[in-house]
Amino acid sequence: MRSAQSKRSQSTATGERTLHIGRDRPIRISAGHRLQHHDGKCSRPHGHNYEISVEITGQLTDEGWVVDKGTVTAVVSDWDHRFLLEDGDPLVDAFREAGDGDAVVVLEQPPTAEVMGVVLERKLHDALPETVSAVSVTVAETPALTAGPN
C-alpha cells in the first residue's frame, strides 16, 4: 500500500498540473479602448472594468508550483489604467502628442475582449517558464460579454 502511495505522489509531482488564477476572484483592471471601425457607440473612446481569469498548465517547478502568480498578475496589470488602441488609430498619435504615449497599448487588431485574451495569452506564454505547456485567458468586458477559449 505504501509503495502505491509513493508512486502516486511521484506521478503528481512530475505530471502536468493546471493553475487557475482569478476563477473565483478575477484579476481586475480598468482600461479604455475604442473600436475605430465599429458602426455603433463602441467607436467612441470609453472604458471598462475588466475581469480576467487565467489557466496555466505545465510541469511543477522546483519551487513546487506551475508558475509564480506574481508574474501573471504583473503581465495583466501592465494594462491597468491604459488605453488600448488598434495600430493605425489616429488616437495613438493624439496620446503621444499630448505627452501620454506611455498610457497607450497598441494592438495589431481591434481591442475587443477576444483580441485582448489572445494577446494576453501570448504575452504570458512569453513571460512564463518553458515548463508551461498551455495558457488560456478569459476576459469579461461586462457581465454580459465574456470572451475566452472554447
Curated annotation (Swiss-Prot):
It is an enzyme of class 4 (lyase). It comes from the Archaea. Its cofactor is Zn(2+). Keywords: Lyase, Metal-binding, Plasmid, Zinc. Its EC number is 4.1.2.50. The active site is at C42 (proton acceptor), H81 (charge relay system), E141 (charge relay system). Residues 1-15 have a biased composition (Polar residues). Signal peptide: none annotated. Zn(2+) binds at H33, H46, H48. GO terms for molecular function: 6-carboxytetrahydropterin synthase activity; metal ion binding. Residues 1-22 are annotated as: Disordered. Transmembrane segments: none annotated. Pathway: Purine metabolism; 7-cyano-7-deazaguanine biosynthesis. It catalyses: 7,8-dihydroneopterin 3'-triphosphate + H2O = 6-carboxy-5,6,7,8-tetrahydropterin + triphosphate + acetaldehyde + 2 H(+). Binds 1 zinc ion per subunit. PANTHER family: 6-PYRUVOYL TETRAHYDROBIOPTERIN SYNTHASE, PYRUVOYL TETRAHYDROBIOPTERIN SYNTHASE. Catalyzes the conversion of 7,8-dihydroneopterin triphosphate (H2NTP) to 6-carboxy-5,6,7,8-tetrahydropterin (CPH4) and acetaldehyde. The active site is at the interface between 2 subunits. The proton acceptor Cys is on one subunit, and the charge relay system is on the other subunit. Belongs to the PTPS family. QueD subfamily. This is Probable 6-carboxy-5,6,7,8-tetrahydropterin synthase. It comes from Halobacterium salinarum (strain ATCC 29341 / DSM 671 / R1).
